[in-house]
């Protein structure tokens, strides 16, 4: 009877309860005080409203700071490998993985809820994860916040906040296999006695080699932020992020051949790689400046404003690699010899963003509802420097794949000149309302209107003069709807359903040289969410369908030789494209105060409109289980954990060379595999702890990626370890 009364309380009681809930969630969200567990109880990633996972009508994963510390995930790409349904394909480079989820690529990255353009801030370019409190992931389309995108997932990185407590300091050092060294420092505290002005400083540096021969990377990052309470209801935030990344050696050719020229197998070491010069280097330097203002009004409405300016600069990236003109022979030679590619590149990205939102309660029909109105703007300019002609030719004699060491003279690159300037502009606004028609029912409805423009200009690298506009795309007043429903079954479980969209501009033109409308990606999702074990363990199960509509196809009324007056081949839009259907289940949080758990299983199938299965060269069934237990009752200060990663088989069908210089289709398959990871931590005292992490404990041999084109493969990482020590004040 008491439970029934709680579920059907009056609207006046609901208003007071909801107000208290919002205040509590705001405190947890802002301060990051989600205790030492894996729950990630609140998020703003889906709607910018502070909602619990159960209140959000989409599948959400939150990687908490505790989980990042337990498993020593120092890079964003490593963090995402712990997320349900995410697969990291490292076909070309360990630095630049391509993440896929729900049958498509993940391209949308946000920082503190503000969108970063692909290329403006990617998981592989990002600085050390030390600057972030947690990572929030929304699976499915998220066009309400972003407009342009894919119906896959959005990743939101949440920065650490300054604390208003006494001075705190945290220092860490670690060393691992392949000369992997790292150090970090995290300082925070009040700058004045009453805590109204406070600051945080985070810095990290690592230097590592790899199981891949002739490859290494160094990365330094700094993050500092200052917060000031201008009034009891107004908060000002300022901050700077800096990241300096230098990769060297085998930067972009980590895969190795699967076949020799006669069709026999190449059985090399897992670290064998392409023929890249040791001196190849790819330096990136990044600065991000941000300022934010938050204000709470007397009527419980909130104003949030944030502006950022970001630059990524590469000065003199040099890449030199050799490749065979024909398949490699068993003795390491090539019948047609070897050629080389020499690339020197510099670029500068400048990106500015502005985001403002206003949200709060309204009363309608004697019930309280929540409304949010938001506007955001993104501008990005990328300048590339290169050289079109007058490249020096060098001679490489008597090359052999088996004997390649990377010790070649430095290539005499020419001076660079401006080659290309591309400008992207995007702006849009959205409005959404969380309607409360019944104490057990919440309906979310919203829509976004977006404009998007991209154009690229080329320049003569000899004279430096403007040559022509190479490319232009424009989208105006694109509408993106959002609809969600959450129904509470009881105090523990809720049913939810959602329909979300995103759009993608298309650089295709019809017979009249008019650019086609954007394609749209739609996500249909239903599921059940729960808060188990006294609300300490989150549970989600979801069934979804992603559909791409309005994809461009060649106009069947014109021959392939026909071109429009501007030299374009005519295209038309043909309705439905690829379809992905899938299922996910996830548990995150704590089973009891000593036992943390993050477990997720996903499976999907992607088909073309003709019914052909796509993406067979990646696993479509993934299981991640990460759990830790604090043995304090048995051995004071000792925590241990195990991680399990399972994936099903996948395959590619490249062309296998034959001895007569012919070829035939040949299937290369990676069977299903289970990887075991371990962690252990011992607190020597209340200030000092030591830790050990072991990945791929059983040293399983497997392929991370298989090329459908030439059959080249990249081996997964062998067993590795990392030993760390941490000291706190």
Residues covered by each model-derived region:
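Acidic, small-polar-rich N-terminal luminal/periplasmic segments of exported/outer-membrane proteins
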Residues: 4-7, 17-166, 526
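Gram-negative outer-membrane beta-barrel transporters
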Residues: 439-440, 545-547, 572-655, 698-699, ...
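Structural signature of Gram-negative outer-membrane beta-barrels, strongest in the C-terminal barrel
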Residues: 229-231, 349-351, 368-380, 387, ...
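C-terminal beta-signal and adjacent terminal beta-strands/loops
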Residues: 646-657, 681-729
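Acidic/polar loop-and-plug regions of large Gram-negative outer-membrane beta-barrel proteins
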Residues: 206-210, 223-229, 233-296, 311-349, ...
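Face-selective signature of the C-terminal outer-membrane beta-barrel domain
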Residues: 289-311, 340-459
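Membrane-embedded beta-barrel scaffold of Gram-negative outer-membrane proteins
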Residues: 294-298, 302-308, 312-318, 495-496, ...
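Outer-membrane beta-barrel translocator/receptor signature
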Residues: 118, 131-133, 144-224, 230-234, ...
């Amino acid at each position: 009877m008491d439970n029934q009364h709680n579920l059907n309380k009056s609207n006046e009681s609901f208003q007071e309860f909801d107000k208290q809930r919002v205040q509590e969630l705001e405190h947890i969200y802002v301060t990051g005080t989600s205790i030492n567990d894996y729950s990630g109880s609140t998020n703003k990633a889906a709607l910018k409203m502070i909602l619990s996972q159960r209140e959000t009508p989409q599948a959400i994963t939150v990687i908490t700071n505790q989980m990042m510390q337990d498993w020593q995930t120092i890079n964003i790409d490593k963090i995402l490998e712990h997320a349900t349904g995410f697969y990291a394909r490292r076909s070309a480079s360990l630095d630049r993985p391509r993440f896929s989820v729900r049958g498509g690529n993940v391209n949308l990255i946000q920082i503190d809820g503000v969108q970063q353009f692909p290329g403006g801030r990617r998981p592989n370019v990002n600085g050390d994860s030390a600057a972030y409190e947690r990572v929030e992931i929304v699976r499915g389309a998220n066009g309400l916040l972003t407009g342009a995108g894919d119906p896959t997932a959005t990743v939101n990185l949440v920065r650490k906040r300054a604390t208003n407590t006494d001075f705190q300091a945290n220092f860490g050092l670690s060393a691992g296999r392949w000369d992997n060294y790292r150090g970090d420092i995290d300082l925070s505290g009040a700058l004045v006695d009453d805590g109204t002005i406070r600051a945080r400083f985070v810095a990290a540096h690592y230097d590592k080699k790899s199981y891949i021969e002739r490859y290494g990377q160094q990365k330094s990052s700094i993050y500092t932020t200052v917060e000031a309470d201008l009034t009891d209801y107004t908060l000002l935030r300022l901050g700077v992020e800096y990241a300096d990344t230098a990769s060297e050696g085998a930067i972009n050719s980590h895969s190795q051949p699967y076949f020799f020229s006669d069709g026999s197998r190449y059985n090399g070491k897992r670290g064998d790689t392409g023929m890249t010069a040791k001196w190849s280097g790819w330096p990136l330097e990044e600065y991000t400046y941000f300022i934010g203002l938050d204000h709470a009004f007397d009527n419980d409405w909130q104003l949030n404003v944030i502006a950022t300016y970001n630059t990524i600069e590469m000065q003199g990236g040099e890449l030199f690699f050799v490749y065979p003109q024909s398949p490699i022979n068993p003795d390491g030679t090539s019948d047609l010899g070897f050629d080389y590619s020499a690339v020197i590149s510099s670029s500068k990205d400048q990106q500015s963003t502005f985001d403002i939102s206003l949200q709060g309660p309204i009363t309608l029909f004697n019930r309280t509802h929540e409304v949010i109105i938001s506007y955001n703007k993104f501008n990005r300019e990328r300048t590339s420097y290169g050289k079109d002609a007058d490249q020096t030719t060098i001679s490489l004699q008597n090359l052999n794949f088996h004997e390649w060491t990377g010790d070649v003279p430095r290539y005499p690159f020419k001076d660079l000149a401006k080659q290309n300037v591309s400008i992207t502009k995007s702006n849009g606004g959205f409005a959404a309302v969380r309607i409360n028609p019944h104490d057990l029912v919440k309906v979310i409805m919203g829509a976004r209107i977006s404009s998007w423009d991209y154009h690229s200009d080329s320049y003569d690298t000899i004279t430096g003069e403007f040559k022509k506009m190479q490319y232009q795309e424009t989208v105006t007043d694109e509408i993106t709807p959002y609809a969600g429903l959450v129904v509470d079954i009881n105090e523990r479980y809720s049913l939810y359903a959602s329909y979300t969209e995103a759009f993608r501009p298309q650089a295709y033109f019809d017979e009249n040289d008019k650019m086609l409308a954007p394609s749209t990606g739609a996500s249909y999702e239903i599921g059940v969410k729960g808060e188990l074990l006294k609300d300490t363990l989150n549970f989600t199960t979801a069934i979804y369908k992603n559909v791409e509509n309005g994809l461009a196809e060649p106009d069947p009324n014109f021959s392939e030789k026909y071109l429009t007056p501007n030299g374009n081949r005519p295209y038309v839009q043909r309705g439905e494209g690829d379809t992905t259907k899938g299922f996910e289940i996830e548990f995150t949080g704590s089973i009891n105060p000593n036992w943390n758990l993050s477990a997720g299983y996903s499976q999907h199938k992607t088909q073309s409109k003709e019914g052909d299965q796509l993406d067979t060269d990646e696993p479509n069934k993934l299981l991640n289980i990460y759990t830790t237990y604090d043995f304090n009752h048995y051995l004071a200060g000792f925590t241990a954990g195990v991680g399990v990663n399972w994936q099903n088989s996948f395959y590619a069908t490249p062309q296998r060379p034959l001895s007569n210089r012919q070829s035939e289709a040949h299937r290369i398959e990676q069977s299903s595999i289970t990887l075991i990871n371990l962690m252990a931590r011992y607190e020597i005292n209340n200030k000092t702890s030591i830790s050990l992490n072991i990945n791929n404990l059983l040293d399983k041999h497997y392929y991370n990626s298989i090329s459908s084109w030439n059959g080249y493969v990249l081996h997964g990482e062998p067993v590795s370890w990392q030993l760390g020590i941490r000291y706190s004040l």
